[in-house]
UniProtKB/Swiss-Prot annotation:
Binding, (6S)-5,6,7,8-tetrahydrofolate: S112, L113, L114, P115
A GO term from the CC aspect: cytosol
SUPFAM superfamilies referenced in this protein's UniProt entry, alphabetically: FMT C-terminal domain-like, Formyltransferase
Database matches in InterPro entries: Fmt (IPR005794), Formyl_trans_C (IPR005793), Formyl_transf_N (IPR002376), Formyl_transf_N_sf (IPR036477), Formyl_transferase-like_C_sf (IPR011034), GART_AS (IPR001555), Met-tRNA-FMT_C (IPR044135), Met-tRNA-FMT_N (IPR041711)
Source species of the chain: Rhizobium rhizogenes (strain K84 / ATCC BAA-868)
Family: Belongs to the Fmt family.
Key words, A-Z: Protein biosynthesis, Transferase
Record field: catalytic activity: L-methionyl-tRNA(fMet) + (6R)-10-formyltetrahydrofolate = N-formyl-L-methionyl-tRNA(fMet) + (6S)-5,6,7,8-tetrahydrofolate + H(+)
Name the record gives this protein: Methionyl-tRNA formyltransferase
EC number(s) per entry: 2.1.2.9
PANTHER family, per the entry: METHIONYL-TRNA FORMYLTRANSFERASE, METHIONYL-TRNA FORMYLTRANSFERASE, MITOCHONDRIAL
Described function: Attaches a formyl group to the free amino group of methionyl-tRNA(fMet). The formyl group appears to play a dual role in the initiator identity of N-formylmethionyl-tRNA by promoting its recognition by IF2 and preventing the misappropriation of this tRNA by the elongation apparatus.
GO molecular function, one term: methionyl-tRNA formyltransferase activity
Keyword Thylakoid part of the UniProt annotation: no
């Protein structure tokens, strides 16, 4: 036996789960993903999502509705006659007609330990908040925002220097295994559900460009968490003068350092920067239009003398 599944996902994060369900022996009736988006150097080429590309390689039918407001779109979903829908970072709101459009409902893979970090950016927010652990949860979806009962949890430790990109990859693999395990249990009616607690609800708002600038007036631990929580995308940044002009420099890696000076002052020739309390050492940087590079390589092309005061951050 196996389950017949409608898979719904869009980014690279979703692809291992799709493959894991197939490897577990389940039948994928169809794949739903977001429509192709303009891409390429001039934005003239339509680029299919990573899930779309993977589904085509696997020989699976792909649907790309803009939304599910159309009755014909809802009817097509129901007529697939699937046992269950699996949703991983799909990116579209699902109406009640879709949530109830399969025999067993919709199950979502969410990258946090719910109810902490409900919403769009749980990976980044967990690191930015200094959390020591997070995880992947499989939950049965309801009409709320990540409010459904939990079926399975897999915790993941967050290392002190781990970036959002590194945590993304770790959770991506953990989530693939967790969803396959959950569907195997669901097939035999062995997947109990537990309601989320009412306490501890925190929302993971989408990252806004306005919050990406580094504020060195904050404690060093907060600055360090800010940098690694936004690495590699969209990237935390500060402004400095290069060749007589102010330029943004992204910081993609950092570590805690020692030292107390004026806020934003460069303490040493290895880019240790004084913060509101303590200091951070910038270890990986990227100039506008350039490639990421180690601090030593950055400094060879752009010397920064000890005693230099960098822009402090938001004003």
């Amino acid at each position: 036996m196996s389950l017949s599944i409608i898979f719904m996902g869009t980014p690279e994060f979703s692809v291992p789960t799709l493959r894991s369900l197939i490897d577990a022996g389940h039948k994928i009736r169809a794949v739903y993903t977001q429509p192709p988006r303009p891409g390429g150097r001039r934005g003239l080429d339509l680029q299919k999502s990573p899930v779309h590309q993977a589904a085509e390689l696997l020989g699976l039918p792909v649907f790309t509705p803009v939304n599910f407001k159309d009755q014909e779109e809802r009817q097509r979903f129901r007529e697939l006659d699937a046992d269950v829908a699996v949703v991983v970072a799909y990116g579209l709101l699902l109406p009640e007609a879709i949530l109830t459009g399969t025999r067993l409902g919709c199950y979502n893979g969410h990258a946090s330990l719910l109810p902490r970090w409900r919403g769009a950016a749980p990976i980044q927010r967990a690191i930015m908040a200094g959390d020591k652990k997070t995880g992947m949860m499989v939950m049965k979806m309801d009409k709320g925002l990540d409010t459904g009962p939990v079926a399975l949890t897999r915790e993941v430790e967050i290392g002190g220097t781990m970036t959002a990109g590194e945590l993304h990859d770790k959770l991506m693999q953990a989530g693939a295994k967790a969803m396959a395990e959950a569907m195997n249990k669901l097939e035999y009616n062995e997947l109990p559900l537990t309601e989320q607690p009412a306490e501890g609800v925190v929302y993971a708002a989408k990252i806004d460009k306005g919050e990406t600038r580094i504020d060195f007036s904050k404690p060093a631990a907060d600055v360090h968490n800010h940098i690694r929580g936004l690495s590699p995308f969209p990237g935390a940044w500060f402004e400095m003068e290069i060749a007589g002009k102010p330029e943004r420099v992204k910081v993609l890696g950092s570590e805690l350092a020692e030292g107390e000076r004026a806020v934003g002052e460069v303490l040493s020739d290895d880019l240790a920067i004084a913060c509101g309390s303590g200091a951070v050492r910038l270890t990986k940087l990227q100039k506008a239009g350039g490639k990421p590079m180690a601090a030593a390589d950055f400094l060879r092309g752009t010397p920064v003398a000890a005693g230099t005061i960098l822009a402090l951050g938001p004003v």
